[in-house]
């Protein structure tokens, strides 16, 4: 059985974090941007390691009791084994935010379904939000005050 480790973003792992993000997302941020996040008290980011190999990440900004998921991703070979869920659990616990928000490409049905299983609801749309290719963003929100983390939508 694989050993999963979820570790906070630090200056020591920032380059691995940035490489992992770049391998998952076409529009990933630069190493310098992630270095700034390490210094930002509103940032909560985690790197997932599976048997010591970088497998995924989550980046969240928290302000005034609200959390915005900037990016989340899991490398293809590590998908569907629960890593994204573990990243969310760790972020939920660390952020202590009641309201959570994210945007997702309208065509990313797998991600939308996953977020809905976590309890997120569709709350809006941003027209032509993404580029390369141009695509709408589905806005999703979760109110943890009214949602028990131990209960999963079936």
Can you describe what each PLM-predicted range is?
Residues 2-6:
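Extreme N-terminal starter segment of soluble prokaryotic enzymes
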Residues 8-77, 88-90, 94, 143-153:
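Acetyl-CoA-dependent GNAT
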Residues 57, 123-125:
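Residue-level detector of high-confidence beta-strand sites
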Residues 75-81, 106-107:
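Active-site acidic-Proline motif in GNAT/NAT acetyltransferases
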Residues 88, 94-106:
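Conserved GNAT acetyl-CoA-binding A-motif
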Residues 95, 117-118:
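Structural motif
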Residues 101, 105-109, 118, 128-154:
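C-terminal "cap" of GNAT-fold acetyltransferases
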């Amino acid at each position: 059985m694989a050993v999963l480790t979820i570790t906070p973003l630090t200056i020591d792992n920032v380059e691995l974090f940035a490489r992992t993000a770049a391998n998952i997302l076409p529009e990933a941020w630069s190493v310098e941007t992630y270095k700034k996040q390490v210094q930002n008290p509103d940032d909560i980011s985690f790197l997932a390691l599976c048997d010591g190999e970088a497998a995924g990440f989550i980046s969240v900004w928290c302000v005034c009791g609200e959390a915005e998921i900037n990016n989340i991703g899991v490398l293809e070979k590590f998908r569907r084994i629960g890593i994204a869920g573990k990243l969310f659990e760790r972020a939920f616990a660390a952020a202590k935010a009641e309201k959570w928000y994210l945007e997702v490409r309208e065509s990313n049905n797998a991600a939308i379904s996953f977020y809905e299983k976590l309890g997120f609801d569709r709350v809006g749309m941003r027209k032509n939000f993404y580029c390369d290719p141009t695509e709408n963003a589905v806005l999703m929100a979760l109110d943890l005050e009214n949602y028990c983390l131990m209960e999963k939508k079936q």
